[in-house]
């Protein structure tokens, strides 16, 4: 399960994953995108948006983004990020934020800037 590759502190439980997946699909504030190649899921992005006073509007948050290690640097991550940007623009979101300890250069290459301990891109 690709989500297990993301988790470093917790083991992803299949039953919780299944229940969460169904709930996320029903949530109007959740965004889930999947990247595939030749019928194989090679990446996913899970994000949300919400209202925030500091932004004078909606803020999107990339909660999880993962691309299979053997499929990195082929454009899947960029496409996943572009997809949440498009979704966010359609919802009049003001910015997208995420926190990461890895891949800072990747996010910078997409136009995100370091802000405190997270990256953001004004939309």
Predicted regions and their residues:
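Short amphipathic alpha-helix that is part of the acyltransferase structural core
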Residues: 1-16
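Conserved active-site alpha-helix within GNAT-family acetyltransferase domains
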Residues: 78, 90, 94-96, 100-123
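A short helix-loop-beta-strand connector motif used in the catalytic cores of GNAT acetyltransferases and
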Residues: 22-34, 61
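Active-site beta-strand termini and strand-to-loop segments that position acidic
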Residues: 36-38, 121-122
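Conserved acetyl-CoA pyrophosphate-binding loop and the N-cap/start of the following alpha-helix
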Residues: 71, 75-83
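Conserved beta-strand in the GNAT
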Residues: 34, 40-49, 66
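Conserved acetyl-CoA binding element of GNAT-fold acetyltransferases
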Residues: 56-69, 117-120
């Amino acid at each position: 399960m690709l989500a297990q590759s993301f988790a470093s502190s917790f083991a992803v439980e299949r039953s919780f994953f299944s229940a969460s997946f169904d709930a996320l699909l029903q949530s109007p504030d959740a965004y889930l995108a999947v990247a595939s190649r030749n019928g194989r899921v090679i990446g996913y992005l899970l994000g949300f948006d919400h209202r925030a006073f500091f932004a004078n509007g909606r803020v999107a948050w990339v909660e999880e983004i993962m691309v299979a290690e053997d499929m990195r640097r082929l454009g899947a991550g960029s496409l996943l990020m572009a997809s949440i940007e498009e979704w966010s623009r359609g919802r009049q979101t003001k910015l997208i934020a995420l926190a990461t300890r890895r891949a800072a250069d990747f996010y910078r290459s997409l136009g995100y800037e370091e802000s405190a301990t997270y990256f953001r891109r004004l939309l």
